[in-house]
A protein has these predicted regions:
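Non-transmembrane, aqueous-exposed alpha-helical and coiled segments at domain scale
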Residues: 73, 78-79
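Conserved P-loop
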Residues: 1-71, 127-129
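Generic beta-sheet signal
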Residues: 3-5, 32, 79-84, 116
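Detector for Asparagine
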Residues: 16, 22, 46-47, 76, ...
């Protein structure tokens, strides 16, 4: 399942993500992973959650993010929930690339039964049609 929180800065996307991360950590029997650029969520996220600062890995494009997610999924078969905060920022504001990323990663997530949630800072009207079904 893919879920996307979209909206402009200050619309509560990250707050919703934090609540979902912590709720997932309380109920999962596997591993919860949260990817962000920087470490602003370190005090907000349950300490059992694997919090990854993507900037430590020089990920700057949607293609690189896809490779990173594939690597995480292949190395950790027990991931049940994957969260990405500010996905569009991680992808250098490349909306087309992010759209390709979401469509490419979907079958991998479904095959492994991984719940996937990401936030993107964008006006709702500018969300590509292929991503609109995932809007939360």
């Amino acid at each position: 399942m893919i879920k996307i929180f979209a909206g402009l800065k200050g619309s509560g996307k990250t707050k919703n993500l934090i609540e979902l991360v912590n709720a997932a950590q309380e109920t999962t029997s596997g591993c919860v992973v949260c990817i962000e650029k920087g470490s602003k969520l370190i005090h907000e996220i349950n300490n059992k959650t694997r919090l990854v600062d993507i900037s430590e890995y020089a990920i700057e494009t949607a293609e690189q993010l896809y490779g990173f997610v594939c690597g995480a999924l292949s190395a950790n078969f027990d991931i049940t929930d994957l969260f990405i905060d500010s996905a569009l920022k991680i992808c250098a504001e490349d909306l087309e690339g992010l759209e390709k990323f979401a469509n490419a990663v979907k079958p991998l997530l479904e095959a492994r039964n991984v719940n996937f949630t990401m936030t993107i800072s964008i006006e709702l009207e500018k969300v590509p049609a292929s991503l609109k079904p995932y809007l939360a």
